[in-house]
Regions:
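Glycine-centered flexibility sites
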Residues: 5-8, 38-40, 58-61, 76, ...
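Alpha-helical hairpin
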Residues: 13-14, 105, 238-239
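Alpha-helical structural signal in soluble globular domains
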Residues: 20, 24-29, 53-57, 83, ...
């Protein structure tokens, strides 16, 4: 489980709130699954503070984007990530999402980071799907690559991603789990068919004033009250006809593939 990432609104929480979220998740489910805590902040000091806290509470690993807002060079990002790995004796996962950070991880910097024994993997959310292939080939079989873009999950797995971390998984986990199940059985064509059902649903989630509000709305309609996202992300009313229809369409898609 990936905590306080983009969909988890980590950047909209202050440091103490992020610590509380991470600690709550570890206490509730840390015995059943590995918890990766995203600790990236606009500055290195607070990122390191969160990394140390993640180790203290028993998280399995940390992860971080580059510092945001300022357009930093590779050496600055290298030192930022290295400082985080030194702040906690935990595996570290690079988070590459250039469309939000304005920093695209080069192979030169990636190879430098691979020299750090605590760098265990990467969440690859960059647009070119072939980045997954490049990072996996350079990192080796034990290096973990997470697919980021939900709309290419099946393709990302085909290119070498070991798993995925995505923003819409919570709204329709059964469909992503079905893709994994089919891939594990070697039924790639059927996995692609499920992806073809999933992708239009993703686009519809993203058509609302905020995807965060829509995802929380779908989960709330399914019986787990989520509340509203934190501003400036806008909420979506639970009685919004578009949201209700989307909820029913997700359920229909799940029913369609249930016995595949």
């Amino acid at each position: 489980m990936y905590v306080c990432g983009s969909t988890g609104e980590g950047f909209l929480l202050d440091t103490e709130e992020r610590k509380l979220v991470a600690e709550t998740v570890v206490n509730e489910v840390g015995q059943d699954m590995n918890i990766i805590v995203h600790v990236g902040c606009p500055d290195t000091r607070h990122s390191c503070e969160l990394a140390a806290h993640a180790e203290k509470i028993g998280a399995a690993a940390t992860s971080a984007v580059p510092c945001v807002y300022y357009h930093l060079g590779e050496e600055s990002v290298y030192r930022h990530w290295t400082a985080i790995t030194e702040a906690a004796d935990l595996p570290f996962f690079i988070y590459n999402i250039p469309q939000l950070t304005s920093f695209n991880l080069s192979m030169n910097l990636f190879n430098r980071m691979l020299e750090n024994p605590r760098v265990a993997g990467i969440k690859c959310s960059s647009d070119p799907a072939q980045d997954i292939l490049r990072f996996k080939q350079a990192g080796g079989k034990d290096f973990i690559v997470f697919n980021g873009p939900d709309e290419q999950y099946a393709a990302g797995r085909l290119l070498g991603a070991d798993a995925g971390i995505g923003g819409t998984y919570g709204a329709m986990p059964e469909l992503y789990m079905k893709i994994d199940e089919l891939i594990d059985r070697g039924e790639w064509e059927k996995a692609a068919q499920v992806q073809n059902l999933v992708t239009p649903l993703i686009y519809r989630l993203c058509s609302f004033p905020s995807m965060h509000g829509a995802v929380k709305g779908i989960i709330s309609l399914d019986g787990c009250p989520m509340g509203d996202p934190r501003l400036p992300f806008l909420p979506v009313a639970l009685d919004d006809p578009k949201l209700v229809q989307l909820y029913h369409d997700i359920k229909a898609a799940i029913e369609t593939v249930k016995n595949w």
